[in-house]
């Protein structure tokens, strides 16, 4: 029987929120170097992609972990209960401390596929997916969701549906799907959410998410709401990659972290190239699917991170503009060196 990582975390624990195209295996190593949270989450992995021959390779790449990740939770999404069971059963051997079902992502494509926040509208299906996942694994199963789909008041009916299933943890983003991140998080509802948890599933760890920027704010919230067990930081990491510490980084420390990110990206790229090349040699069908081309990591998504490191000093915008014209990590390093960083 696997340990319940949620029961081992300290009161007031911190989590890096799962963010599509952000919290991959490379960036998590950067955050770990700056100052890691108590718990990491992966990016979202679609259960039906894992269940298909065509999509499994990509799903497994999303689930890759580094030694510095532990403990880490695999976050998964979808709407097919059997596929939830299939992926949940495979996760035990991949180094995860648990799995989390996303029932809160507001992305319209995810919602159109019946996943993420769309599950708020299909509570019976949501419960069945949760049950199937839990039955297939000894890992603790948790859920991340929102207050509701359209109206804030939905939480009074929606959260008890989940809590009655006794998930290991429940993370509540304090907004609705309709609100996205356009309005302030509804911190005023925390006491009522706590009462719901205490009355329905007192053993479930409660995590709050939304408008939480750094460790200092986590501690302030912990003092105000001592019954909440943990806090999840998402976009705050873009403002300060040291957000899980009390350290205020200097400009040069941020550039040092930037160069580390580039090095880790290159290492992951080389690893992916080697793995793909080996598989193509061993599997002619896979080589045919790849058109005989060995592909590493795409460079363009790396540019999403530049604003984390290059901000808050005179000339930052101009330097970022130059960096955005780069096409390789070597070009990025050359621009940084020329700029004196």
Tell where the protein language model's regions lie, with residue ranges.
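Alpha/beta enzyme core
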Residues: 33, 85-99, 103-113, 124-206
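N-terminal small/glycine-rich loop or linker at the start of catalytic domains
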Residues: 9-13, 48-71, 105, 110-113, ...
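Alpha/beta catalytic cores of nucleotide-metabolism and tRNA/nucleoside-modifying enzymes
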Residues: 1-10, 14-15, 20, 26, ...
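Hydrophobic faces of well-ordered beta-strands that scaffold small-molecule active sites
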Residues: 14-17, 40-42, 72-76, 99, ...
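Conserved phosphate-coordination/catalytic loops
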Residues: 78, 120, 124, 184, ...
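Short glycine-enriched, charge-decorated loop/helix-capping segments at active-site entrances
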Residues: 114-120, 179-180, 247-248
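Active-site beta-loop-alpha junctions enriched in small/polar residues
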Residues: 19-21, 45-47, 77-79, 104-106, ...
